[in-house]
């Protein structure tokens, strides 16, 4: 029998997974990725990479012992992992459209897009932090054996990196939309699917906790990554929706000023 937990998991994974396709399809149909900020897609790809590693470790490398309660394990499912892996791969595809649209996708235009220097520094800083955290994690496990508390600390740090990327990545996209003063070629369908997935993800977590250990500061700390990602996604997607209502009546000529 399918439970409410499974239904919510299917809804959020399906919604978030499908939301990856409108940008790619829209860019392909219009032969341009001008509506997508390069800073956004670069930061998003890095963030998804951190998230995939974090969820993989928590799902498949969690050491079950008699001394530690399974209640301390973050409430993650197979849905979370496969959604994130799929999202990471789709972001790589979107990245090829933005970075190499003319060469790979045969988009017209010869312009070369570059990252904003500030966002490039942020990306490089996050990669440096990720490298340091990973070296420290591997060193500790090599000398002091594998321990769940150490794994959780490392995974939460990766979640923090992902949340940081999510907080920052939307800013250049919001700015990009504002600069163009147009939502032409912007995949608003993906935004609505994102909102649906974010709400379903939060409802699933609430349902899981209400049937398990209940709500407390400890459970929030343990699951703050999932809560944080859902809230950030919802907040910025509502901003995109407001921009869409403001700019949707603008003409298509403004968007043409920003070719690939």
From Swiss-Prot:
GO biological process entries: L-cystine transport
Annotated GO MF terms: L-cystine transmembrane transporter activity; symporter activity
InterPro entries named in the record: LC_transporter (IPR005282), PQ-loop_rpt (IPR006603)
Function: Cystine/H(+) symporter that mediates export of cystine, the oxidized dimer of cysteine, from vacuoles/endodomes.
Glycoprotein keyword on record: yes
Family matches, as NCBIfam families: 2A43
The protein's name: Cystine transporter
Membrane topology type: Multi-pass membrane protein
Domain of life per record: Eukaryota
Entry's Gene Ontology cellular component terms: endosome; endosome membrane; fungal-type vacuole; plasma membrane; vacuolar membrane
Residues of the PQ-loop domain: 1-67, 162-212
Protein's gene: ERS1
Residue positions the entry lists as glycosylated: 177
Coiled-coil annotated residue ranges, if any: none
Key words, A-Z: Endosome, Glycoprotein, Membrane, Repeat, Symport, Transmembrane, Transmembrane helix, Transport, Vacuole
Catalyses which reaction(s): L-cystine(out) + H(+)(out) = L-cystine(in) + H(+)(in)
Family membership noted in the UniProt record: Belongs to the cystinosin family.
SMART domains per record: CTNS
Subcellular location: Endosome membrane; Vacuole membrane
Organism: Saccharomyces cerevisiae (strain ATCC 204508 / S288c) (Baker's yeast)
Residues spanning the membrane: 7-28, 40-62, 81-102, 118-138, 151-175, 185-205, 227-247
């Amino acid at each position: 029998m399918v439970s409410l937990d499974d239904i919510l998991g299917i809804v959020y994974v399906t919604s978030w997974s499908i939301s990856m396709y409108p940008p790619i399809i829209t860019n392909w149909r219009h032969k341009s990725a001008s509506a997508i900020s390069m800073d956004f897609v670069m930061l998003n790809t890095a963030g998804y990479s951190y998230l995939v590693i974090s969820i993989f470790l928590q799902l498949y490398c969690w050491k079950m012992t008699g001394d530690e309660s399974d209640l301390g394990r973050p409430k993650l499912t197979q849905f979370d992992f496969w959604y994130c892996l799929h999202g990471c791969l789709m972001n790589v595809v979107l990245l090829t459209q933005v970075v190499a649209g003319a060469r790979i996708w045969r988009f017209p235009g010869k312009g070369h897009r570059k990252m904003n220097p500030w966002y490039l520094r942020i990306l490089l800083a996050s990669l440096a932090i990720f490298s340091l955290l990973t070296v420290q994690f591997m060193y500790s496990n090599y000398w002091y054996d594998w321990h769940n508390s150490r794994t959780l600390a490392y995974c939460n740090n990766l979640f923090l990196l992902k949340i940081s990327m999510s907080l920052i990545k939307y800013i250049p996209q919001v700015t990009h939309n504002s600069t163009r003063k147009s939502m032409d070629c912007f995949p608003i369908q993906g935004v609505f699917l994102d909102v649906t997935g974010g709400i379903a993800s939060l409802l699933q977590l609430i349902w899981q906790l209400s049937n398990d250990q209940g709500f407390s500061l400890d459970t929030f700390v343990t699951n703050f990554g999932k809560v944080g990602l859902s809230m950030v996604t919802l907040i910025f997607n509502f901003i995109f929706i407001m921009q869409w209502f403001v700019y949707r009546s603008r003409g298509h000529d403004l968007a043409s000023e920003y070719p690939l």
